[in-house]
Amino acid sequence: MWGAGLQLVMHTSTLAAAIEEIVIETTRTNNNYNITDSSLTKFTEPLQDTPQSIITLSEQLLDDRGAMSLNDALRNVPGITLGAGEFTWQGNNPTIRGFNSRNDMFLDGMRDYGSYARDPFNLEAVEVLQGPSSMVFGRGSTGGVINQASKQPQADIIRKLNINVGSANTVRVNADFNQPLPIVGSAFRLNLVNHRAEMPARDGAKTELYGVAPSLALGLGDATKLTLSFMKQQSDSRPDYGLPWVAGVPAPVPRETYYGFEDDYIKTDADIGNIKLDHSFNADLTLNAQLRYAQYARSSRITEPLVNGVVTANTPVQTVIINRNVFSGESTEDMLQGQVNLLANFATGSVNHAVVTGVEIAQESSSPTMMIAVGVPATTLLAPANIPFSATRMQVRARADTNSDSLAAFVLDTIKFGSSWQLLVGMRWDHFATHYTGNRFDQIGNTAGTEKIERTDIETNYRTALVYKPVEQGAFYLGWGTSFNPSAEGLSFIANARNFGISNAFLEPEQNSSVELGSKWEVFNGRLRLEAALFEIVKSNARVPDPTTPGFNALAGKQTVNGVSLNLAGSLAPDISISGGYAYLDSEEAKTGPTLDNQGRPLLNVAKNTFSFWLNYTGIDAVELGTGARFVGERLARNVSPILSAPEYWSFDAMAKYNISDNLIVKMNVTNFTDELYFDQLHPFHVVPGAGLSAVFALNLSY
């Protein structure tokens, strides 16, 4: 991903057939902000005619905004808020349209489960599909799905090298090389990254990672194309678990205050190998097949700051003691996935059909070991000691092995009645079987529980929508869809990282549905796309504590989100590009258990109002300027008493680029240029401040 960086670019023209192939292979990487097509083969229609809110962050947009992580990219999407890391999960933890989506990460249409912080070095776009989508993706997707579209080999020559240097000791080098091979229709592509940075205005936290992603394509421009790819991302970072909550709000201390130990760590290693086959039998019949093996390894020792005792708003802050709650663990996840999709276009009389049907299989496993530290020295709220880790002992609290087998089949038909009306109907059948073995221990090592659980969930989900196109440039739609959340959705029955309880183990899946009424328009000769949608998402049987069986949950709750989304992307004029939007989310715990007092309150980590925009101007000779803003409303980290809330905030960014020549460009990105203190990632036990004012300088060279 080309954030601010030194770029070395070479493009050479080849034969006419190769030029045609370039157009085919790069339709998703428009040189602006208006992406017209999804990378997902399950969608047969352009985004303009797809009856769902889909926000695509183009490579160009992420480049202009200087995004260096997937979280940087997701902050540009209204309706998304970020959660902080916890004991059993680190990495990307977004909430989409009111519901947590950390298990709804996909890479090129296949599940990307790993608990790791994703880097966009090998991505050409990030697609956010909003609303329940189990008919397309299987389990999960209550609020939506995030799909990462990888860079693919092309028929042209590309040579790029990025070097970024900036605030907080940021040094980032990434490269993109694409080379057509002597065999006609073949090409090799290689993407690399090495990234080191601390967190601006946060002492202690830092990130170190590298990544490599080679890919080989055979048959570019032919009826049959085979693509082999591999991606490795390895990190060794010091985690940031932020500040403690004090009297219901983030601790009143300088934002750089760090409560962790100087040798805390999170180490992750993601290895993803993929084989993809695309074959066109003719213009109306296409086969897409993928086979993937992925392994995700993780080890960590993290420190969470917790207030010792009862602290009120009247407690002198200089007397507050902080307990360092230290968790340690390691895990390995393995995933073997296969997909086969068949796309067919045909007619029945005067009615046209675009049908996608397919099958999916997967074997997934997870083997975590979780420990806590006993006898950890405490510290003070105002002056935490920056020392190496020490403890009396490490105590294993849980070991688990989870193996899941899934099988799915689906069919989706877009039925076209003339040029004005389309009807989309689809269904998917999922078989999700989980085998779990777990051992739990108390804080002194005694066995607290040994479980062997086998559970099979069989679910059918549906999707239907009606689209009306009064003119070619505009569409109105009304859609309905469903999704489900099984108890082992995250490859574990451990539902509580505090007591390691298996409170959801014997429950049927949660059921979700969504209704969305929207409209999409292309204006200014197709340069700018405008979208608006009204929607309602209902989780009809949310998990709540079972009053009759302590330690277990019951499907007796209900959660709702009613909302509005407004989005635009593209160009106001040839020299003005814009991307932005607004989301209004009215979330509610509509029904809760008798042991809770949160009925009627908003859902966790949901801002009622979020807003984001970015404007880029290239009308000044040799100069390019960009500016943007982001607003996130108040959010709750806990909605039962005592309530924990983080205040609303604004953040402003800017970019300046100067073209010294056609071959040399200098660039600077400034993030949070007002140095706003805000809280970016929430958790019921801690809250992480956002980055302070920072600048990254870059040099771009092309020839």
Predicted regions and their residues:
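Membrane-embedded beta-barrel scaffold of Gram-negative outer-membrane proteins
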Residues: 278-292, 296-304, 477, 506-571, ...
